[in-house]
């Protein structure tokens, strides 16, 4: 007698840590459950857990805006896997060698920005259509902070991105060199800056610190 059992879901395990991510129009939710990733369909009221696992509990989840089936999950030590959720396929392994505090795909999905201690690394994302020998290729490393980087926020065009750090500052970087542009620092906080945001027209930048202070700059 032959049987064809396959992994479908995790029962009895609860959320421990890591960020949750909405995908598409908000009808899908990705949530870390230990060292696995669960997917919730909020419209059909169903869920399943992917049959892939990281070495340690998941600390960060990133979803590509250009293809919401493309998801990166990184564990506490910086070991990451890239998954195609719709096909339930494991695309690549990556060791970032340091804990990943934030990871964000660019708006077009072609780049992945990852915190790396006091630096930010931007990687070219692999194609989901072809199998590549080196799926992740380092584009550039960005420096300027003096302590761990905590968050990354891309501009709508993907030409610039914001970072925040424990050094109580935020910085604006360009993805590629722009004539006449130098990375700009946003200071004035008295505690770690946990997040930064672009205004609607991206003329103003807001930084928020752990002590609930919000500052704006242009």
Question: What is each of the regions a protein language model found here?
Answer:
Residues 11-15, 52-58, 94-100, 142-149, ...:
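WD40/WD-repeat beta-propeller blade N-cap
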Residues 1-43, 121:
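Intrinsically disordered, low-complexity acidic/Ser/Thr/Pro-rich linker and tail segments
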Residues 2-4, 39-48, 82-92, 117-139, ...:
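Per-blade loop-tip surfaces of WD-repeat and WD-like beta-propellers in eukaryotic adaptors/scaffolds
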Residues 32-49, 55-60, 78:
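N-terminal cofactor/phosphate-binding cores enriched in small/glycine residues
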Residues 33, 74-77, 115-118, 164-168, ...:
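Conserved strand-to-loop turn within each blade of WD40 beta-propeller repeats
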Residues 107, 116, 124, 144, ...:
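Core solenoid repeat modules with strong leucine/isoleucine-rich periodicity
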Residues 20-26, 62-68, 103-109, 146, ...:
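Loop/turn segments within WD40 beta-propeller blades
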């Amino acid at each position: 007698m032959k049987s064809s059992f396959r992994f479908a879901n995790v029962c009895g395990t609860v959320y421990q840590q890591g960020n949750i991510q909405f995908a598409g129009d908000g009808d899908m939710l990705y949530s870390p459950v230990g060292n696995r990733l669960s997917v919730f369909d909020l419209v059909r009221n169903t869920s399943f857990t992917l049959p892939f696992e990281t070495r340690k509990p998941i600390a960060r989840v990133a979803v590509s805006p250009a293809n919401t089936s493309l998801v990166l999950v990184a564990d506490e030590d910086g070991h990451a896997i890239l998954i195609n959720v719709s096909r339930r396929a494991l695309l690549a392994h990556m060791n970032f060698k340091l804990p990943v505090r934030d990871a964000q795909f660019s708006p077009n999905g072609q780049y992945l920005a990852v915190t790396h201690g006091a630096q930010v690394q931007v990687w070219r994302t692999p194609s989901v259509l072809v199998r590549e020998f080196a799926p992740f290729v380092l584009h550039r490393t960005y420096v300027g902070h003096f302590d761990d980087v905590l968050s990354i926020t891309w501009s709508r065009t993907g030409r610039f991105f914001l970072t925040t750090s424990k050094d109580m500052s935020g910085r604006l970087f360009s993805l590629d060199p722009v004539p006449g542009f130098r990375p700009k620092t946003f200071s004035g906080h008295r505690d770690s800056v946990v997040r930064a945001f672009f205004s609607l027209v991206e003329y103003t930048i807001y930084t928020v610190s752990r002590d609930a202070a919000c500052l704006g700059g242009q």
